[in-house]
Amino acid sequence: MTSEFGSPSESLQAAAEDWMTSAGRLRVYRAGQGPALLLLHSINAVASSAEVRPLFEALQRHRTVYAFDLPGFGRSDRSDRPYTVSLMCAAIQDVGERIRAQHDAAALDAMALSLTCEFLARAVTQQPSAWGHLTLVSPTGFQGAHPRTGSPGSTAEVPGMLKLLHWGGLGRRAFSALTRPSVIRYFLRRTFGREQIDEQLWRDGVQAAQAPGAHWAPLYFLSGALFSKDSLDVYRQLQHPVWMSHGVRGDFTDYRQAQAVLQLPQWSLSVYDTGAIPYFEDGARFIQDMCEFLATPGSVGHQR
C-alpha cells in the first residue's frame, strides 16, 4: 500500500532479519561490534523501532546494537490475534536468548521506552541471570496520587472494550482516525511537549500506519490490556542496575510513585529539560550519561 509518503519502509536503516519466535515473526535490526545491547521501542498506535533511531545510530560505534519491532508493530507479524503482556514478554525473552547465544551467553544490557519498560522489567524478573544493566526511559506505572496495585499478572483492561473495538470494524475506524498525519503530529507534539517535533519520526509513524494489519495490536493498547496493574511490584523486584530517565515537558511527566523504587540502591535517575524521549532532543548528553551507566560494574544484586 502506498501514499504520498511512500510505502512502509524499514524501521531502521541497518541489516534486518526476520526471526521466528514463540511470539511470531519479528523483524530484528543489528549494527556495530562489541558487547550486545538491546533497544526496545514504546507502544502506541504507530510504534516501531524508528523510535530508538538516535541511540541505534550512535551506540553502534561501541556496541553490537540490536532492536526489533515488537509483535503487531513495524515490520513484524501484524496478524489478527490476541496481543497481551505475556506475548510482549515472550518476544523480549526469545530475542534476548538468541542475542546471548551469539555473544557467548553474556548477560544482556537493554533499554526500553515508555510502556515497554513494564514488559522488559517483567521479562527480567522471569530470568534474572540473563540480563545486565537496564535503561528505562519515561517508564509507565509511576503516575497518579496512589500506587497502581493489582494481583500478579492483572491488567487495566476496560471490561468489554476489546469486544466493542472488534465489533463491526469500529476499531479499524478508530485506528484510521487516530493515525491521520495531522493526528500523529498532534500526539507527537504532546510527547515532545512543544510544537517542534522530530520530522523523521513523524514520517516513520505515518508510514507505519499504512502496513496491512497495523490496527490489530493498537486495539489492545487502547483497551488497556497492555497496562499491568502490578507494574510497581515488578519494578521493585529488579535486582539489576537500573537507570531511569524522563523529561519535564509534555504529557509524560507524572512520576509521583517513583520514590518506591528510587529509594532502592540499585536505581538511579536523570531528569532532562526535554519531552518524553530525551535522546531526540538532548542526544549528546543522554548518550554520554547512558554510556557512563553501562560502563559501571554491575550484575544481579549489584548496588550503586
What annotation goes with each model-predicted range?
Residues R173-R236:
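Conserved alpha/beta-hydrolase catalytic His-Asp/Glu region
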Residues T125, W131-L170:
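Flexible "cap/lid" loop of the alpha/beta hydrolase fold
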Residues F5-R25:
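N-terminal cap/lid segment of alpha/beta-hydrolase-fold proteins
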Residues F119-A123:
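Hydrolases whose catalytic domains are alpha/beta-hydrolase-1, hotdog thioesterase
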Residues Q237-T274:
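Conserved loop-alpha-helix segment in the C-terminal half of the alpha/beta-hydrolase fold
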Residues R27-R75:
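Conserved HGGG/HGGXW glycine-rich cap/lid loop of the alpha/beta-hydrolase fold
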Residues R53, A67-L115, Q288:
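Active-site loop/oxyanion-hole signature of alpha/beta-hydrolase fold enzymes
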Residues T274-I287:
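Catalytic histidine-centered segment of alpha/beta-hydrolase-like enzymes
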